[in-house]
């Protein structure tokens, strides 16, 4: 039986979101959540979780290219812990190195510079995080 999984691309101003199914291993972007200094509208996130009822939530873990942590890594972990604490959902972390760069390249390839709006980039980043998580699950 397949799982429904939500993914979040944590940021201090915007949090990208995507939903996917483990059967297909693919994801689709959902509208990004605005955040103020990394604090989201928890009610809006709660509504999203209630609507999709995911079996698992994946949060992108922003690491430096050499695998070391940065300030945003700590904040993304805190966001993941709060998701679990507030909503009781199973949360996993996924290395997200290069997802924003890949997302920008994908969007630019489709529509040029004008297509590069922040919420699209965040949504596609969340898709890439989720799809790479699905790939890692098949390896295990």
UniProtKB/Swiss-Prot annotation:
Which InterPro entries did the record assign?
RNaseH-like_sf (IPR012337), YqgF (IPR005227), YqgF/RNaseH-like_dom (IPR006641), YqgF/RNaseH-like_dom_sf (IPR037027)
Where would you say this protein principally sits, based on its record? cytoplasm
Assigned keywords, A-Z:
Cytoplasm, Hydrolase, Nuclease, Ribosome biogenesis
Q: Per the record, GO CC terms?
A: cytosol
**Where are the bilayer-spanning segments?**
none
What role is this protein assigned? Could be a nuclease involved in processing of the 5'-end of pre-16S rRNA.
Q: What is this protein called?
A: Putative pre-16S rRNA nuclease
Give the organism, scientific name: Pasteurella multocida (strain Pm70)
Could you read off the lineage of the organism from its UniProt record? Bacteria, Pseudomonadati, Pseudomonadota, Gammaproteobacteria, Pasteurellales
């Amino acid at each position: 039986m397949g799982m429904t999984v939500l993914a979040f691309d944590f940021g201090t101003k915007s949090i990208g979101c995507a939903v996917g199914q483990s059967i297909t291993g693919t994801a689709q972007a959902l509208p990004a959540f605005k955040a103020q200094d990394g604090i989201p509208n928890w009610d809006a996130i709660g509504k999203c979780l209630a609507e999709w009822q995911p079996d698992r939530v994946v949060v992108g873990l922003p690491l430096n290219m050499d695998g070391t942590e940065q300030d945003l890594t700590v904040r993304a972990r805190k966001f993941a812990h709060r998701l679990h604490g507030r909503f009781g959902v199973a949360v996993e972390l996924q290395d997200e190195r290069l997802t924003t760069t890949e997302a920008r390249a994908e969007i630019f390839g489709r529509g040029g510079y004008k297509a590069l709006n922040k919420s699209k980039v965040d949504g596609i980043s969340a898709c890439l995080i989720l799809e790479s998580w699905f790939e890692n699950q098949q390896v295990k």
